[in-house]
Amino acid sequence: WISNAVEGGVLAILAKTDPEAEPRHKGMSLFLVEKSSEFQVSKRMKKLGYKGIDSGEFVLDDLFVPGENLIGGVEGRGLQQILSGLELGRINVAARGVGIAKACLLKSVEYAQVRKTFGKPIADHQSIQIKLADMATQVESARLLTEQAAAAYDKGERCDMEAGMAKLAASEAALYNSLEAMRLHGAY
């Protein structure tokens, strides 16, 4: 499967170009491939979230790719090229998670100030304040981890661990705050 397989016209394909290379990952190269009759998408994959970019299974049938389509001009560096994008990808996912978590917090605060029980806004109840404080803590911790990873990336430093931690924390924050926001909006 590959991202943008259905809607994309040009795709990056990682292919084994030297079957004798040791270790085995050394014999992979990255190519830009235009979709053609030799490149067929067999089906669009169903996704739970992040539907802005499609994913699809594809079949390559006697596909010929000219050497000039080799990315970077050096054969055998494909896996390294693919892996080098993981840090930035994880930071981007973390940033989305922070945005979701923060939006849930802001909407929850807004609603808690308007919704009333027992004659006062629910924001005045300690149990709601604790919930909102926990949500704010999730946002800030995820944001700080994401900014730390992004700063390291911008400096050209290795940040695979930081990016992974930020992605995990921000994804968990987005889930936690989404569930808490639904609970808080229960009477909406």
Place the predicted regions along the sequence by residue:
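Short, charged, solvent-exposed linker or helix-capping segments at domain edges/interfaces
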Residues: R24-H25, S42-R44, G67-V74
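A short core secondary-structure module
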Residues: W1-Q40
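Short coil/loop residues immediately preceding or within conserved phosphate-binding loops
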Residues: G8-V10, S42, S55, D160-M161, ...
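Alpha-helical interface subdomain recognition
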Residues: E57-L63, G73-R77, Q81-Y188
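Flexible, small-/acidic-enriched active-site or ligand-binding loops
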Residues: E38-L63
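Short, well-ordered turn and helix-capping elements at secondary-structure junctions
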Residues: T17-P19, K43-M45, F64, Y188
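Basic, amphipathic alpha-helical recognition segments used for DNA target recognition
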Residues: V33-E38, G67-E68, K102
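Glycine-rich phosphate/pyrophosphate-binding beta-alpha loops
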Residues: W1-A5, Y50, L88-G89
